Regions:
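Phosphopantetheine-dependent thiolation modules in NRPS/PKS and related acyl-activating systems
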Residues: 2-37, 46-48, 52-81
Length: 81
């Protein structure tokens, strides 16, 4: 799976599972803050999704990879087996 496919899969997850409006969600949109408004519970769902769909563990990582779809995708790419 290339990085564009990873980003598309992540965006679909944010829209379907977390209820994020796709019209305001771009790959570089900040996920935690006023615009999207995800919270710590959502971060647990993101961790679970990444682990089960990409076989990459995000458990115990800092908040940097969670900034946007771009940063989550980059984390996945750099930690693939």
């Amino acid at each position: 799976m290339n990085s564009e496919e990873v980003k598309a899969k992540l965006k679909a997850f944010f829209m379907s599972d977390l209820g994020v409006d796709g019209s305001v969600l771009n790959y570089d949109t900040p996920l935690f803050g006023e615009e999207i408004g995800l919270d710590s519970v959502d971060s647990l769902e993101i961790i679970s999704f990444v682990d089960s769909n990409f076989n990459v563990s995000m458990t115990g990582v800092g908040k940097e990879p969670f900034q946007s779809i771009d940063t989550i995708s980059a984390f996945i790419e750099s930690h693939k087996a």
